[in-house]
Amino acid sequence: MKSIGIAELIAGLELGAPLAPELASRLARGVHFDSRRIEPGWIFFAFAGANVDGRNFALQAIEAGAIAIVSELAPLPGLESNWIQVKHARKALALVSRSLFENPTHGPLALFGVTGTNGKTTTVYLLASILEAAGFETGLFGTIGYRIGKQILASVNTTPESVELYEHFSHLMAETSRRPAVAMEVSSHALSLGRVWGMHFAVAIWTNLTRDHLDFHGGMESYFEAKCELFRGQDAAAPDVAAINFDDEHGRRVPIAASTRLWSFAMRESSPPSTVRAINIQTGFAGVGFDLVTPQGTFQIHSPLLGEFNVSNILAAATAALGYGIPIEAVREGIEKCPSVPGRFERVDVGQPFLIVVDYSHTDDAIRNVIRAARALNPTRVITVFG
């Protein structure tokens, strides 16, 4: 991180109250929303959460050396000269972090974002495998964990807070001379809350949309609009490439910016014409195989992943990679080398004379797809344990 004066750092933010004059000339060296992470010269962001008011930790942050407190709420008594009130704290954190970390997603870092109800995790793992096959130093962020180069971390949120992402991006770029790339799940919560505000995505991928998170969004149309934010660009240029699932009726409605190159994909004969298509699909206990029809020609693909629904995930990753310009040889290699994703129609083998799979089916549509995929393997019986 570089040091920047507060006046310069907040120049583009929507303030909720005038800035205290004594704050303007202070030099910021870092930023965080966790008061336990604050160091001298840093800014503390006090989020107003559903259960916890971040202002309760403002004094702790000041004692740790914070030079300013940022909040959407009014200052606590006695802290007026340290307070910066903003209209949207998470968007402000994202923009301040972007400046302090010198804007990596607008420069050397290639950022691939995957949104949708189902298939995000598997698509991200496939993308990471393809990027590695193409020679990138790769980071991965998703529901079941984060990976920065060779370092593996437990995940707290599907999409981390903005400053955490920038910290991880910085570590990834520091440990290699190869070009860095990140494949990450981008949840509707993250898009609505502003966690990726100001980040430029080289490629944005749409998997599908089914009923989920309606308690947060209030309805399917609001849920759809939240997902579409990834393709509009939030205080950043729209994605260079959009990889859209044309098998999904909602995907065909996603707004694409004039500057974005559309690469669509499909596997159903009834779907509209698409840039990339899967034909001659075969599924079995060894995985899936199909012919990948692309603008560069038709290529045979095989993956150890089980279930026809994974063909759509493979298509999403392959289309995103091809749209970005990754050679088909690296795409095929990455798909073939990508192992079973933990908890995603994952094979469990302890020597039993039958197939067991475990799947994180968190929606009714996902459960239907899993049972359909199991039946397509032509077993004598399918036993489902759900809980």
Task: Mark where each language-model region is.
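Acidic, Mg2+-coordinating active-site environments of NTP-dependent enzymes
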Residues: 76-80, 175-178, 192, 201-356, ...
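ATP-dependent carboxylate-amine ligase
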Residues: 1-27, 37-43, 53-56, 91, ...
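Conserved nucleotide-sensing/catalytic segment adjacent to the nucleotide-binding pocket
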Residues: 157-187
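Switch II (G3) loop of P-loop NTPases
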Residues: 180-189, 356-362
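Walker A (P-loop) phosphate-binding motif
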Residues: 98-145, 149-152
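Residue-level signal for inorganic ion chemistry
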Residues: 42, 61, 96, 114, ...
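N-terminal leader/targeting and accessory segments in enzymes
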Residues: 1-95, 99, 277-279, 300, ...
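Flexible beta-alpha connector loops of hexameric P-loop NTPases
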Residues: 151-162, 212-219
